[in-house]
Every structure is written in structure tokens, then in C-alpha cells.
């Protein structure tokens, strides 16, 4: 009896740790075609797809690891898979390497997650917890819009739709298969998901 209670307690504990980052789906369950050739070419890659996404993510890994603790903290706080946050950071700013004084996109995008000052008021330091929290909350708001728009989609499909909407807005997501048409290089969610799956394998 005592052993059963211990096992039940352990199961509850493990369940809690899983749910702390899995509220919006599990990134490894999402299908992805990876980066388009349009995304791969500026990275000087002569191939496209998941392999290209993984290579770009690998190049960003050392810079990303500086923020690993922070990314995991924000992910657990907001119940979002830290690997997804890392995937977005890689795509948006190459983990900060593409930024000038914390800004990108011709001075419109702020921080690691490139919060657009035309739509939001950026908060915190470009590489700090408040910024990552704001970026992740924007992602969550997009996921919730997709949940409302496509209630019959699986959790993972809604997560992928939310990632796509993070780039081009929920109005751009019209179907699962074509959600990335209209995003930057027409591959945003597929590329981010493939990068996130790479980061998942590296402890995010």
C-alpha cells in the first residue's frame, strides 16, 4: 500500500513536470518539411528542408546556450515547450547574432524573439527574462486564436498554427497544409518546428 502511494506520488510529480511545458502540445509530435530553399540559400546551404533547419539550429547552438537557463525558466513559467522558444529565437535573430544593439528588421524588431514595435510595446532588455516572457506571451495569444479558429485541430496542429501566426498573424492561417503560405519565405512554422526539434534533442 505504501509503495503504491509512493508510485502514485512519483507519477503525479512526473506528470506535473511534463505539463509545465506541454500545455500547448509536444513539438516532437509535429510534422514538418523544414526550411525552404529561400531560407537556406542566404545561410550558404545548397540543400533545403529539415536538414537545413537542423544545420542552422546547430550553428546557433553555442549562442543559444547562453540563454538556455532563461529560456527554460520562461517556458516552465508559461507552460510552453522551451525548445519552441529556442526555435523561434534561432529563426528570428540567430540567438542574437543577427541583431544590432538588440534590434533587427530595420529597427522594427526588438530582442531575441523580435517583438515588433509596430504591434507591441517592447519591454525589458533585448536578451532578458521580461523580453522572453513578452515574446512567449505573444506566441500563446496566437496559439489561442488558432485554437478558437480551428477547434477540431489537434493540440500539435494548433501549436504549429500559432507558430505560423507569430510571424504573419492568425488571419494568414487558413488551412493546416498551407498555413505557411504568406509567412516570411513561406516556411516559418515548418522551419521553426524543425529547429525546435533539434533543440529538444539538446536539452531544451
From Swiss-Prot:
GO terms for biological process: defense response to Gram-positive bacterium; killing of cells of another organism; peptidoglycan catabolic process. Keywords: Antimicrobial, Bacteriolytic enzyme, Disulfide bond, Glycosidase, Hydrolase, Secreted, Signal. GO terms for molecular function: lysozyme activity. Gene3D superfamilies: 1.10.530.10. It is found in: Secreted. Its main location: secreted. GO terms for cellular component: extracellular region. Residues 1-19 form the signal peptide. It catalyses: Hydrolysis of (1->4)-beta-linkages between N-acetylmuramic acid and N-acetyl-D-glucosamine residues in a peptidoglycan and between N-acetyl-D-glucosamine residues in chitodextrins. Disulfide bonds join 23-79, 37-48. SUPFAM superfamilies: Lysozyme-like. The active site is at 92, 105. Pfam families: SLT (PF01464). InterPro entries: Glyco_hydro_23 (IPR002152), Lysozyme-like_dom_sf (IPR023346), Transglycosylase_SLT_dom_1 (IPR008258). Its EC number is 3.2.1.17. Transmembrane segments: none annotated. Has bacteriolytic activity against M.luteus. Belongs to the glycosyl hydrolase 23 family. This is Lysozyme G. It comes from Dromaius novaehollandiae (Emu).
Amino acid at each position: 500500500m505504501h509503495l503504491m502511494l509512493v508510485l502514485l506520488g512519483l507519477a503525479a510529480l512526473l506528470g506535473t513536470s511534463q505539463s509545465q511545458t506541454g500545455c500547448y502540445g509536444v513539438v516532437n509530435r509535429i510534422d514538418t518539411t523544414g526550411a525552404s530553399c529561400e531560407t537556406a540559400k542566404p545561410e550558404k546551404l545548397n540543400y533545403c528542408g529539415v536538414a537545413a533547419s537542423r544545420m542552422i539550429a546547430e550553428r546557433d547552438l553555442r549562442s543559444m546556450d547562453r540563454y538556455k537557463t532563461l529560456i527554460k525558466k520562461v517556458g516552465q513559467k508559461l507552460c510552453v515547450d522551451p525548445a519552441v522558444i529556442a526555435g523561434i529565437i534561432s529563426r528570428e535573430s540567430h540567438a542574437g547574432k543577427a541583431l544590432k544593439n538588440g534590434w533587427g528588421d530595420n529597427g522594427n524588431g526588438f530582442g531575441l524573439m523580435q517583438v515588433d514595435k509596430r504591434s507591441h510595446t517592447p519591454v525589458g532588455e533585448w536578451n532578458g527574462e521580461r523580453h522572453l516572457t513578452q515574446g512567449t506571451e505573444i506566441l500563446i495569444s496566437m496559439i489561442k486564436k488558432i485554437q478558437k479558429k480551428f477547434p477540431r485541430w489537434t493540440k500539435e496542429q494548433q501549436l504549429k498554427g500559432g507558430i505560423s501566426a507569430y510571424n504573419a498573424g492568425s488571419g494568414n492561417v487558413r488551412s493546416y497544409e498551407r498555413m505557411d503560405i504568406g509567412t516570411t519565405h513561406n516556411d516559418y512554422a515548418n522551419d521553426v518546428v524543425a529547429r525546435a526539434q533539434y533543440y529538444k534533442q539538446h536539452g531544451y
